Amino acid sequence: MKFSPLLDALIRELQVLPGVGPKSAQRMAFQLLERERKRGMQLGQTLQRALTEIGHCQHCRTFTENSLCDICANPKRAESGQLCIVETPADVAAIEQTHLYSGRYFVLMGHLSPLDGIGPKELGLDQLDNVLQGGQWKEVILATNPTIEGDATAFYIASMAKRYQINITRIAHGVPVGGELELVDGTTLSHSLSGRRPLE
């Protein structure tokens, strides 16, 4: 069925969101128009403000409305001497939800991918090099994704950090908690076996 040009445009623009196809976008558009017009207006205003006002933290490059994010603005977060390097701001949120890490972050906003034109410059590795030179870091935790690109990025950063005599660690990955071995793919299982540690 053909809708009005404006409704078609709304449905098309909603599909920019991850996991939203034509049917889901149509349901969202109808919901906003049929029942949630006031909330839809608020959504539009908030979205416009967010896209205009949210930028990157000057230190770690995560999203924030201020020059520094809350983590970088907190001096206690530097006391651990730990710097966790992640690919995206969503990774920061995931690690923060564990409540197990109290250091600072550096967000790459991606990973090395020469075929896509993403090299060290695009990831801000020159800025990271300046951060590493500060002399305050005891440990760099490489928390890039366990993919070919994520591993390549981690190895590249590790070679940078070694110049400053910083302890370099990589997050463990392997069999998920509650997972069954027969359902785990071979690559993940091989990582788990090679990354095994003594039982304490």
Curated annotation (Swiss-Prot):
<comment type="function">
    <text>May play a role in DNA repair. It seems to be involved in an RecBC-independent recombinational process of DNA repair. It may act with RecF and RecO.</text>
</comment>
<dbReference type="InterPro" id="IPR015967">
    <property type="entry name" value="Rcmb_RecR_Znf"/>
</dbReference>
<comment type="similarity">
    <text>Belongs to the RecR family.</text>
</comment>
<feature type="zinc finger region" description="C4-type">
    <location>
        <begin position="57"/>
        <end position="72"/>
    </location>
</feature>
<protein>
    <recommendedName>
        <fullName>Recombination protein RecR</fullName>
    </recommendedName>
</protein>
<dbReference type="Pfam" id="PF02132">
    <property type="entry name" value="RecR_ZnF"/>
</dbReference>
<dbReference type="Pfam" id="PF13662">
    <property type="entry name" value="Toprim_4"/>
</dbReference>
<keyword id="KW-0863">Zinc-finger</keyword>
<dbReference type="Pfam" id="PF21176">
    <property type="entry name" value="RecR_HhH"/>
</dbReference>
<dbReference type="InterPro" id="IPR023627">
    <property type="entry name" value="Rcmb_RecR"/>
</dbReference>
<dbReference type="GO" id="GO:0006310">
    <property type="term" value="P:DNA recombination"/>
</dbReference>
<dbReference type="Pfam" id="PF21175">
    <property type="entry name" value="RecR_C"/>
</dbReference>
<keyword id="KW-0227">DNA damage</keyword>
<keyword id="KW-0862">Zinc</keyword>
<dbReference type="InterPro" id="IPR006171">
    <property type="entry name" value="TOPRIM_dom"/>
</dbReference>
<dbReference type="GO" id="GO:0008270">
    <property type="term" value="F:zinc ion binding"/>
</dbReference>
<keyword id="KW-0234">DNA repair</keyword>
<keyword id="KW-0233">DNA recombination</keyword>
<dbReference type="GO" id="GO:0003677">
    <property type="term" value="F:DNA binding"/>
</dbReference>
<keyword id="KW-0479">Metal-binding</keyword>
<dbReference type="GO" id="GO:0006281">
    <property type="term" value="P:DNA repair"/>
</dbReference>
<feature type="domain" description="Toprim">
    <location>
        <begin position="81"/>
        <end position="176"/>
    </location>
</feature>
<dbReference type="InterPro" id="IPR000093">
    <property type="entry name" value="DNA_Rcmb_RecR"/>
</dbReference>
<dbReference type="InterPro" id="IPR034137">
    <property type="entry name" value="TOPRIM_RecR"/>
</dbReference>
